[in-house]
Design a protein with these regions (language model features):
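Short beta-strand segments
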Residues: 273-275, 286, 298, 350-355, ...
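Short gly/Ser/Thr-rich phosphate-binding loop of adenylate-forming enzymes
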Residues: 362-365, 437, 443
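Alpha-helical solenoid repeat scaffolds of the TPR/TPR-like class and their adjacent stem/linker regions
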Residues: 1-342
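Glycine-rich phosphate-binding loop used to anchor ATP phosphates in small-molecule kinases
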Residues: 334-364
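Conserved nucleotide-binding/hydrolysis micro-motifs of P-loop NTPases
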Residues: 301-302, 381-384, 438-439
Length: 519
């Protein structure tokens, strides 16, 4: 195979255009991790041979690796039409759905892969992980067992079994499996960080909180080292610096133009579900999603063009404030077109955009959607910071800054301060939703939220846990959500009081602001 790849690359270098040779040259680049160089070769190969299933499949995979999963889907569907009994395009289509957070669609494609090729150990491993996320531990063990029988070194299958063992409180079995994984010097950085986090969860479950904290810290350090080149000195404006710049601008900006509410009868009622990560936005989003008149969009970036033009440039806010309303229409259309592309219809009475960190984009929301309502979720700041430290997120520049307790506390303070500033200066239609109140008084608090959204309380909203057990949800705590309402994590920060002590002064004003007692 290596010889064939080399021949393909040499032919490409000489300008010889044959689809199979171009495909081989592209594969060589992709194996080297250079999908950018592979992409034009595969495009040309498709032009020369538009019905070649192998070329279409490789192009689809290349698009996934370039983070262009939505484009990849149509290409992979074309590959499947040409060769419906091939497992490869179905597997790559599953990877595209995973990248898009469409985990139920990912599961369906993986099941098709296994139906076509029962010994596909990678598909079995991913099915095991999805089952663990749903708390379906019987399916987890079945899929993982089959994967490991075919490929004893299949790391995702081992990780899935660990998740099932932790969920079943079989901490000793989970520890033994994790110790073996962590001894593997070839374990890649992402899986090592995940294994360290899971070891922390094992120790946390056993009440060994000081040891658990050291594991979480080790996981953060692994991620920090691994992503240092990409995010450590990216040259981008940091999340906190951006918020400080926005707040500085609005300290002297006239309020009138940013308060231009139309009070039009909106169809649908447009709502932004904001807060800070790990504050309870996911739980509330899933509760709202059970209502027949509410559609919830989960963390999809539909404002990226407006961010590019008005938030990133230093003079962007001044430009945004000066634009007449009609000049903003293309950005509104772009927002809704992106929502439709993600599969949302916006045809129900209420459309909820759940985007916790979009709290920093309140200026855009105010100008583009002046009649939007804001559901602002908050939770004990100490539990929020601890939860962020214990969980792993898809890495971004913002998340890279949140790999230490100091970094999380600083980002929290900046974002909450910005939200408070906007409340005081600008007229926002805001409902404050306290996470602990939703847990303690579910029905009455849900009724209050429904009243704010102009819909009646619906009994189906209680069934979020059963929906989570059937569906896969693209969030770090999907397994917790599948267990239903639980107050066991409330006040969990007390178990890590000593470790959190250095950041307590930074969090104290916010504990007081939201009414959480010192002890």
């Amino acid at each position: 195979m290596e010889r064939a790849l080399a021949i393909g690359e040499e032919a490409s270098r000489r300008g010889i255009e044959h689809p199979n040779l171009l495909g081989l040259a592209a594969q060589k680049h992709m194996r080297a991790g250079d999908s950018e160089r592979a992409y034009p070769l595969l495009l040309r190969a498709r032009e020369l041979s538009p019905h070649n299933a192998d070329i279409l499949n490789d192009l689809g995979l290349c698009l996934v690796r370039l983070s262009r999963a939505r484009e990849a889907l149509s290409t992979l569907e074309a590959a499947i039409r040409e060769k419906p009994d091939s497992a490869r395009p179905h597997f790559n289509k599953a990877l595209a759905h995973e990248q898009l957070g469409e985990l139920d669609d990912e599961r369906r494609e993986l099941e098709r892969v296994v139906a076509i090729e029962p010994r596909h150990h990678q598909a079995l491993s991913l099915l095991a992980m999805l089952a663990a996320d749903r708390n379906d531990y019987k399916a987890t063990r079945d899929y993982a067992g089959r994967a490991l029988a075919l490929s004893p070194d299949e790391v995702p299958a081992k990780i899935a079994l660990v998740s099932a063992e932790i969920g079943s409180r079989d901490f000793n079995a989970a520890r033994l499996r994790l110790e073996a994984l962590l001894r593997d010097t070839d374990l890649d950085a992402d899986n090592r960080a995940l294994a360290q986090t899971l070891m922390g969860d094992v120790l946390d479950g056993e009440g060994k909180f000081d040891e658990a904290f050291r594991c979480y810290a080790a996981s953060a350090e692994t991620q920090k080292t691994h992503y240092a080149r990409a995010f450590g000195a990216s040259g981008q404006e940091s999340f906190r610096a951006q918020i400080e710049r926005l707040q500085s601008y609005f300290s002297s900006a006239p309020a009138e133009i940013w308060n231009a509410r139309k009070n039009d009868a909106q169809t649908p009622v447009h709502v932004f579900l904001l807060g800070f990560v790990r504050s309870g936005t996911t739980l509330l989003g899933q509760v709202l999603a059970g209502h027949p008149d509410i559609e919830v969009m989960h963390e999809r970036d539909c404002l990226n063009e407006a961010v590019r033009d008005f938030i990133v440039p230093k003079d962007g806010l001044e430009h945004l404030g000066a634009l007449p309303d009609e000049a903003l229409m293309p950005y509104r259309r772009s927002y809704w077109q992106k929502a439709y592309a993600w599969g949302y219809s916006a045809e129900r009475k209420v459309f909820v955009d759940k985007s916790p960190l979009a709290t920093s984009l309140l200026p855009l929301i105010a100008r583009l959607f002046p009649d939007a309502r804001i559901l602002f979720v908050y939770r004990d700041p100490r539990d929020v910071v601890l939860s962020c430290f214990r969980r792993r997120f898809a890495m971004t520049e913002q998340k890279y800054q949140m790999l230490t307790l100091d970094g999380i506390a600083a980002c929290y303070g900046s974002l909450m301060g910005f939200a408070d500033f906007w409340r005081e200066k600008f007229r926002l239609d805001v409902f404050d939703a306290r996470h602990e109140t939703l847990l303690a008084n579910f029905e009455s608090e849900t009724a209050r939220i429904c009243d704010f959204l102009s819909v009646a309380l619906d009994p189906a909203m209680k069934d979020f846990a059963s929906r989570a057990r059937v569906a896969n949800i693209d969030i770090p705590n999907s397994a917790d959500l599948a267990r239903g309402l639980s107050r066991k994590s409330e006040g969990h920060w007390r178990n890590y009081r000593n470790e959190l002590m250095p950041i307590m002064p930074a969090l104290a004003p916010w504990c007081a602001r939201f009414g959480y007692p010192e002890n």
